[in-house]
């Protein structure tokens, strides 16, 4: 497993943020196993869009940690 990567979406419009998340996940997937923390801040709308438009169509595991509701942790283990 690679070290945890971080993607901070502060300052991005939703469309740009979604494209950046998609591109980052594709890049990390090509490398194999990964862990990615996506920082969304207080935007529950953006979080929901990331869940519905990107993550639900992937085999990745993801969750919003209880200690920081402004982020999404995504992980993938390739055997």
Where are the regions a protein language model picked out?
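Long, charged, low-complexity intrinsically disordered regions
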Residues: 1-79
């Amino acid at each position: 497993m690679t070290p945890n990567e971080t993607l901070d979406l502060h300052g991005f419009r939703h469309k740009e943020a979604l494209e950046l998340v998609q591109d980052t996940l594709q890049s990390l997937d090509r490398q194999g196993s990964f862990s990615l923390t996506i920082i969304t801040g207080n935007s529950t709308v953006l979080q929901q869009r990331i869940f519905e438009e990107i993550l639900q169509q992937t085999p990745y595991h993801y969750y919003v940690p209880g200690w920081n509701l402004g982020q999404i942790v995504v992980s993938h283990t390739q055997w």
